[in-house]
Amino acid sequence: MSDNQDILAVIALTLPDGSVKTFPIGTTGNDVALSIGRKLAQDALALRVNGVAIDLSTPLTADAAIEIITFSSPAGQDIFWHSSSHLMAQAIEELYPGSKFGAGPSIEQGFYYDVASTHRFREEDLRKIEERMLEISKRDIQIRREEMSRTDAIEFFKTVRNDPYKVEILEDTLKEVERVSLYHQDGFTDLCIGPHIPSTSKVKAVLLSNISSSYWRGDSARENMQRIYGITFPSEKLLKEHVARLEEAKRRDHRKLGAELELFMLSPEVGSGLPIWLPKGAIIRNELETFLKEEQRKRGYLPVYTPHIGNIELYKRSGHYPYYSDSQFPPLTYHDEEGKQEQYLLKPMNCPHHHLIYSSKMRSYRDLPLRLTEFGTVYRHEQSGELNGLVRARGFTQDDSHIYCRPDQLVDEICSAIELTQFVFGTLGFSEVQTRLSMHDPENQAKYGGTAEVWEQAEKDVQEAADRMGIDYFIGVGEASFYGPKIDFIVRDALGRKWQLGTVQVDYVMPERFDLTYTGSDGQKHRPVVIHRAPFGSMERFIGVLIEHTAGNFPLWLAPVQAVVLPIAEDVLDYAKSVHQALLAAGIRAELDTRSEKIGKKIRDAEVSKIPCMIVIGQKEQESGEVSLRRHRIGDEGRFSVSGLIEKLKTEITGKS
């Protein structure tokens, strides 16, 4: 072989640390991992080449920047769990022949697969499937990718697999695609873009958690399916850690704590997904609303109120109907005295109503920005299987604001909305916040309102504002709303779970649909830009997340009961009552425990109720005109005069510490 041929047969691969290694053409990711170390090769799941993840078995033919993907990274977990959904499907097919499979994606914590089967799955079946998955894992089946034309794939899934769901995907969703990829593991084959783990043996621990109902393609008019959820790990140790987190999550479950702390209730007599706020929960919600209203007032927002229903024509004009019709309650049909028919919808969004408020009078460039705000209740007909206490409800209240501004004011207003959202999260103890710039998918322009040029400008403005605010963000292509790009704020709670809460969204589309205008300095009409903004997102969801984040241990300013007065004996009851009244008069939410229980029992009950301050009063306190302060989860803090205690607590409450 000549020197030139030797040079051509070598490729240079740049590793994450910047070092460069040369390998023969045709080297695979597995070869690279082995060259670095046996442990890395054991942990390797896939390879990232120039930013794109591929299978470890794929030959490399050109110079590239590469990275070995392991389970320790989000990308590795995504690949591992999606591969595990195929493993579960293979196990189900072996145990329950004739089962067919719909969608089987990875999710944030594991995976699921929608299964069409004559067998009605029960809890005990999950254990059988787990056992079979581990048995398949021990077979060490090499997972093999095959590419073929879409036409050949349709024939394969019709004749070999007899899988109508994959045929439908190929004939419908992928109709513009020429070639597709399949993944084989023994006798099981599935349609998938990949990549996948190299072998079933990578899966060492399995937990299938629950079964719910679903519909093919999420359409209630289509076939009913059974959705099986699970999670897998490359070691038993990781599974045990996961189970421990699940136990802690159960302890923090907002539905459990909501009942124990008497915050909210759900009743079948009212309807699924329609929470009722009890007095203590209403206090928390009111405190949060008051907090945000005060901050908005400082920033020039104007409050409005709008109805809970609206004429369907309003939502047709905005595009919310029929765009969101699958998640809306059916229209209410009304006939007036003359027989004329009108249809109304339970309000799916507040924004169309706010746009009408804007257009109710002529606006000048001097009037802008106009910032309208409302805690408006909206309604979505979520599927019953998706409902989850407060965090996924059918009726919920959004802290909705719409800012109408001139184009030259836009970036400043986005920055102001970002600052307010950051302030809200910081005040409420969410220190880990990710920011996603949710952009449109240019390959699917028909999904969005407005022109490509409008979207280009909107996304440029969003990114400029994020850069100006120094936000560390990532871009989510295809995550935008149909009328504009968004800045989504994703908080991480005390258990490490991620929740998408607040949002700031730019909208050039609705001003066109509602013909919103203002008179410029040139005397001509111009279009304003709209910013949709909601730091909480929805009050129900935010409070549900907050309950779990704090485990019900709310900060003093937010606690429904801020202090409880605990007299040690009946002979100090009159003094305890006077202390209680002094606290109430100072605006502190306080209770008085007059039960004839021992002080230890009263303290334990107050701890269980998660009351921040316990004010203990005995003979010594009465004689000195003082009180003893005990903090929830902390213990004794010493004795104070009544006025000194009140001043101390009010300072903490005002400072929201």
UniProtKB/Swiss-Prot annotation:
<keyword id="KW-0648">Protein biosynthesis</keyword>
<dbReference type="InterPro" id="IPR006195">
    <property type="entry name" value="aa-tRNA-synth_II"/>
</dbReference>
<feature type="binding site">
    <location>
        <position position="532"/>
    </location>
    <ligand>
        <name>Zn(2+)</name>
    </ligand>
</feature>
<dbReference type="InterPro" id="IPR002314">
    <property type="entry name" value="aa-tRNA-synt_IIb"/>
</dbReference>
<dbReference type="InterPro" id="IPR004095">
    <property type="entry name" value="TGS"/>
</dbReference>
<keyword id="KW-0067">ATP-binding</keyword>
<keyword id="KW-0479">Metal-binding</keyword>
<dbReference type="Pfam" id="PF02824">
    <property type="entry name" value="TGS"/>
</dbReference>
<feature type="binding site">
    <location>
        <position position="351"/>
    </location>
    <ligand>
        <name>Zn(2+)</name>
    </ligand>
</feature>
<keyword id="KW-0963">Cytoplasm</keyword>
<dbReference type="GO" id="GO:0005524">
    <property type="term" value="F:ATP binding"/>
</dbReference>
<comment type="similarity">
    <text>Belongs to the class-II aminoacyl-tRNA synthetase family.</text>
</comment>
<dbReference type="Pfam" id="PF03129">
    <property type="entry name" value="HGTP_anticodon"/>
</dbReference>
<keyword id="KW-0030">Aminoacyl-tRNA synthetase</keyword>
<dbReference type="Pfam" id="PF00587">
    <property type="entry name" value="tRNA-synt_2b"/>
</dbReference>
<dbReference type="InterPro" id="IPR047246">
    <property type="entry name" value="ThrRS_anticodon"/>
</dbReference>
<dbReference type="GO" id="GO:0046872">
    <property type="term" value="F:metal ion binding"/>
</dbReference>
<dbReference type="InterPro" id="IPR012675">
    <property type="entry name" value="Beta-grasp_dom_sf"/>
</dbReference>
<dbReference type="InterPro" id="IPR002320">
    <property type="entry name" value="Thr-tRNA-ligase_IIa"/>
</dbReference>
<keyword id="KW-0436">Ligase</keyword>
<dbReference type="GO" id="GO:0000049">
    <property type="term" value="F:tRNA binding"/>
</dbReference>
<keyword id="KW-0820">tRNA-binding</keyword>
<comment type="function">
    <text>Catalyzes the attachment of threonine to tRNA(Thr) in a two-step reaction: L-threonine is first activated by ATP to form Thr-AMP and then transferred to the acceptor end of tRNA(Thr). Also edits incorrectly charged L-seryl-tRNA(Thr).</text>
</comment>
<dbReference type="GO" id="GO:0004829">
    <property type="term" value="F:threonine-tRNA ligase activity"/>
</dbReference>
<dbReference type="Pfam" id="PF07973">
    <property type="entry name" value="tRNA_SAD"/>
</dbReference>
<keyword id="KW-0862">Zinc</keyword>
<dbReference type="InterPro" id="IPR045864">
    <property type="entry name" value="aa-tRNA-synth_II/BPL/LPL"/>
</dbReference>
<dbReference type="InterPro" id="IPR004154">
    <property type="entry name" value="Anticodon-bd"/>
</dbReference>
<feature type="domain" description="TGS">
    <location>
        <begin position="7"/>
        <end position="70"/>
    </location>
</feature>
<dbReference type="GO" id="GO:0005737">
    <property type="term" value="C:cytoplasm"/>
</dbReference>
<dbReference type="InterPro" id="IPR018163">
    <property type="entry name" value="Thr/Ala-tRNA-synth_IIc_edit"/>
</dbReference>
<keyword id="KW-0694">RNA-binding</keyword>
<dbReference type="InterPro" id="IPR033728">
    <property type="entry name" value="ThrRS_core"/>
</dbReference>
<dbReference type="GO" id="GO:0006435">
    <property type="term" value="P:threonyl-tRNA aminoacylation"/>
</dbReference>
<dbReference type="InterPro" id="IPR012676">
    <property type="entry name" value="TGS-like"/>
</dbReference>
<comment type="subunit">
    <text>Homodimer.</text>
</comment>
<feature type="binding site">
    <location>
        <position position="402"/>
    </location>
    <ligand>
        <name>Zn(2+)</name>
    </ligand>
</feature>
<dbReference type="InterPro" id="IPR036621">
    <property type="entry name" value="Anticodon-bd_dom_sf"/>
</dbReference>
<keyword id="KW-0547">Nucleotide-binding</keyword>
<protein>
    <recommendedName>
        <fullName>Threonine--tRNA ligase</fullName>
        <ecNumber>6.1.1.3</ecNumber>
    </recommendedName>
</protein>
<feature type="region of interest" description="Catalytic">
    <location>
        <begin position="253"/>
        <end position="555"/>
    </location>
</feature>
<dbReference type="InterPro" id="IPR012947">
    <property type="entry name" value="tRNA_SAD"/>
</dbReference>
